[in-house]
A protein has these predicted regions:
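Active-site histidine-anchored catalytic micro-motif
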Residues: 9-16, 78-138
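Glycine-rich loop at the start of a catalytic domain that most often binds anionic cofactors/ligands
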Residues: 45-52, 83-87
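Short catalytic helix/loop segments, enriched in acidic residues and glycine
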Residues: 51-63
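Short glycine-enriched loops at secondary-structure junctions
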Residues: 68, 74-77
């Protein structure tokens, strides 16, 4: 298993080689966290990526408590009131739904049977409830 001296076992998808990845699936018992947020204006006092940075950090800290895999963050979410502001990326809900649907299929194909979204953006709440209710995988 890939380790570093400070944090112990690394369970971050993108940092593992193929052999470590296979072991991580077993270690995680098939559980994966997918951080999701959005890129949006938060004023001049906070980064545009605040939502995804928070969601990613929560997922990484959780993986240090429980052996669960962490997927690279998804920087796209449902943006309403600031969708036309500088730095904001606003995609359609259909595109995000289809992306998440295919992503869940691919994550399952790779050996994960329990997918947990770690949401850092309030605008995603109802959308994710809808997605989880209607998706064929979850």
């Amino acid at each position: 298993m890939f380790k570093n001296e400070r944090d112990g076992i690394i369970m971050e998808w993108e940092k593992l080689n193929v052999d470590d990845f296979s072991n991580a699936i077993d270690e995680s018992k098939g559980v994966i966290l997918i951080p999701i947020g959005c890129l949006e204006k938060h004023g001049s006092h906070m980064p545009i990526g605040t939502d995804i940075l928070i969601a990613r950090e929560i997922a990484i800290r959780a993986s240090r408590i429980e052996n669960v895999m962490v997927f690279p963050f998804i920087p796209f979410g449902i943006v309403g009131e600031v969708k036309h502001k500088l730095g904001t990326i606003s995609l359609t809900s259909n595109l995000i739904y289809n992306m998440l649907d295919e992503l869940c299929d691919e994550v399952a194909r790779n050996g994960f049977n329990k997918i947990v979204f770690v949401d850092g953006h309030g605008g995603n709440h109802n959308f994710l409830k809808y997605f989880i209710y209607f998706t064929s995988f979850l």
